[in-house]
Amino acid sequence: MLHNKILYISRIAIFSAAATVLALFSFPIPPLPSFYKVNLSDSIVIIGGLALGPLAASLIIFIRTALVLLVKGTSTFFIGNLADMLLSFSFVMPIFVCKCNRTLRGAVKEIGAGIFSLCIFSLVLNYFVLVPLYSKIASVPYNEILTCNNNLLIQFLCAVLLLNLLKGILCGTLALFIHRRVLKFH
């Protein structure tokens, strides 16, 4: 019994460390504002969650966020880190709610549900909470935060949807390719 708990905690630690390393290598998408970055760490969270369950996925997200803060710090007054954590939850948790049959088609449906959730939640969270909060804390005018077009709604549709759709597709595809190989060691 104790051996199983130690093994479970060790696996969470390994997945958290791998997710942290991938989170440190985030990259911006050139036409988007520089603070919108893609990292592939959610693919590790998905794999860890599928191997160990939704509680483990939640712990991996929390540990990854804390470790990234310790190693990298923050340049967005913790708002970017909060956004990354909340959006990771919105992407990963629908995968566990769907409970499609464990086939490739089922996995694609689950990841599709996660991508849909990520895109919708990111739009709502950015438009109503994160950007206004960042604008207020950083004393930056709301209009200057996003500079793609004059229409703020189009900017959000352009930047937030493109970024999160790309992130969801990349992370989901990476998780699908790696997941089968990881299950051999589970």
Where are these regions (language model features)?
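Loop-helix junctions at membrane interfaces
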Residues: 1-186
